[in-house]
Amino acid sequence: MEKPEILGIALFPALVISTLIIALSCGPNPPFCPQGCTVEIVNPLDDITLGNPNSLEPSNRIQAFVTDPEGFAINDVRVRFSLSFAQQNSLVVDTNGDGVSDARALQLVDPDRCKPQPCDLIPISQWFQQGAFVDSPYTNLTDDRGVAEMIILISGKVSVDPATFEASLDNGSVDSFQFSVNSQ
């Protein structure tokens, strides 16, 4: 064997091993939930009737609780939230009167995106600038208590019956509820 041929044979395994070491040292990313974990929506919404059809009103904060097979809270796992009428192309509300729909009937809000104060403590008009409005479906991580949270913003101009909210894990565990929004 010639010298370049031997160098090539020795270099290839070293390259493969170093690539594996680098890839494995990145840690458990993405944070998938182990098999047997479950998700439960703690506070599902009931039907909502809005008093002022021209307002934007935040609904309750929705919490999804993730547990391992033994029933203990599990942190830093992905929870996928999905809300009907809140997808990227679900524009059904005309906000400026020009006859063109330019807003969603329901809007998902990530409460962790408002900084330095939580979204609950700042006016709704600032949520967009903070980047808190997100498209459905949206993935969020659980905190150290096993809870992932979302806020649903409701436009009072449109009736929605029924809307479906779903929280799911990558292992197939799903919890959902239906509710309706009706203007008076």
Locate predicted features.
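The feature marks long extracellular or luminal low-complexity segments
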Residues: 23-184
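Sec-dependent bacterial lipoprotein signal peptides
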Residues: 1-25
